[in-house]
């Protein structure tokens, strides 16, 4: 979807909403044009435009959320990070640009082909050396890492934007891998507004299927004494969990 300024937006999930949960499209466009696009690094702008042409572009991180993650990582002085769910690498590039020169990202995804769409831009941006990309399911690798005491509490920040039906399985493992005071960010925790949609809302099949898993995650995080949480209506909803015990 092209905007009045010529920018291409990702496709909508379904009729209930889109990548912004704001009720006003005009207000969301104002945020993008005033605060996001003018500050968006050129490599991220280039990758966003390329990704917008991909048939699965609704999987990408929104531009305002990419900006949010970039600033958050700088605020917490993150150095060692993990990302589960990479797609073409927009949020990955946002992270890589925020980290110091010796920062590291363990990037996990089941599809290398999608990652390679953004890889030339990541390389051109001079941050590819920060990324350790692993293709395959994340859970077996997380279980392997948990067997190594050196991995416990070793990550400053972990971002999860992958299979929603495994979010709780990820959380059970990631809580031991993130350091005390470190942050885990779960994406899509408002799931396009479908969490409060009427029973007869025109939800796509996959949205309706994953809805219950997102609801289950939100309920679990709300009562988890090991973390402080903050759920924000940025992008499709992101919940930040700061480990405290």
UniProtKB/Swiss-Prot annotation:
The positions annotated for binding a divalent metal cation are: 161, 187-188
| Record lineage | Eukaryota, Viridiplantae, Streptophyta, Embryophyta, Tracheophyta
Which InterPro entries has this protein been placed in?
A: Cation-dep_OMT, SAM-dependent_MTases_sf, SAM_O-MeTrfase
Supply the alphabetized keyword list.
Answer: Lignin biosynthesis, Metal-binding, Methyltransferase, S-adenosyl-L-methionine, Transferase
EC annotation from Swiss-Prot or TrEMBL: 2.1.1.104
Matches recorded under PANTHER family: CAFFEOYL-COA O-METHYLTRANSFERASE (PTHR10509:SF64), O-METHYLTRANSFERASE-RELATED (PTHR10509)
The terms under GO molecular function for this entry are: caffeoyl-CoA O-methyltransferase activity; metal ion binding
Q: What role does this protein play? A: Methylates caffeoyl-CoA to feruloyl-CoA and 5-hydroxyferuloyl-CoA to sinapoyl-CoA. Plays a role in the synthesis of feruloylated polysaccharides. Involved in the reinforcement of the plant cell wall. Also involved in the responding to wounding or pathogen challenge by the increased formation of cell wall-bound ferulic acid polymers.
- State the organism of origin: Zinnia elegans
The pathway that the record names for this protein is: Aromatic compound metabolism; phenylpropanoid biosynthesis
Which cofactors, by name?
a divalent metal cation
Gene that codes for this? Answer: CCOAOMT
Recorded family membership: Belongs to the class I-like SAM-binding methyltransferase superfamily. Cation-dependent O-methyltransferase family. CCoAMT subfamily.
Cofactor binding mode and count: Binds 1 divalent metal cation per subunit.
Question: Which residues are noted in the entry as S-adenosyl-L-methionine-binding?
Answer: 61, 83, 85-86, 91, 109, 138, 163
- According to UniProt, the name of this protein is Caffeoyl-CoA O-methyltransferase
Q: Name one Pfam family in it.
A: Methyltransf_3
Amino acids binding substrate: 19, 161, 192
Instruction: Give the catalytic activity.
Output: (E)-caffeoyl-CoA + S-adenosyl-L-methionine = (E)-feruloyl-CoA + S-adenosyl-L-homocysteine + H(+)
Its GO biological process annotations read: lignin biosynthetic process; methylation
**Gene3D superfamilies recorded for this chain?**
Vaccinia Virus protein VP39
- Spell out the PROSITE patterns in the cross-references: SAM_OMT_I
């Amino acid at each position: 979807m092209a905007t009045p300024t010529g920018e291409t937006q990702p496709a909508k999930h379904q009729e209930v909403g889109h990548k912004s949960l704001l009720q006003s499209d005009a207000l969301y466009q104002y945020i993008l044009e005033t605060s996001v696009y003018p500050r968006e690094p050129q490599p991220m702008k280039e990758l966003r435009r390329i990704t917008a042409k991909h048939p699965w572009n609704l999987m990408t991180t929104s531009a305002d959320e990419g900006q949010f993650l970039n600033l958050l990582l700088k605020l917490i002085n993150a150095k060692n990070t993990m990302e589960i769910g990479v797609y073409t690498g927009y949020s990955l590039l946002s992270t890589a640009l925020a980290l110091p020169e010796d920062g590291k990202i363990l990037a996990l995804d089941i599809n290398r082909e999608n990652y390679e769409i953004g890889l030339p831009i990541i390389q051109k941006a001079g941050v590819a050396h920060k990324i350790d990309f692993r293709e395959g399911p994340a859970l077996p690798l997380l279980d392997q890492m948990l067997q190594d005491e050196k991995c416990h509490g070793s990550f400053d920040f972990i971002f999860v934007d992958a299979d929603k039906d495994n979010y709780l399985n990820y959380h059970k493992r990631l809580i031991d891998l993130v350091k005390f005071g470190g942050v885990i960010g779960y994406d899509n925790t408002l799931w396009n507004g479908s969490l409060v949609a009427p029973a007869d809302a025109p939800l796509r099949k996959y949205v309706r299927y994953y809805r219950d898993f997102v609801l289950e995650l939100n309920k679990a995080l709300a009562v988890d004494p090991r973390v402080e949480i903050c759920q924000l209506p940025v992008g499709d909803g992101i919940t930040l969990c700061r480990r405290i015990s």
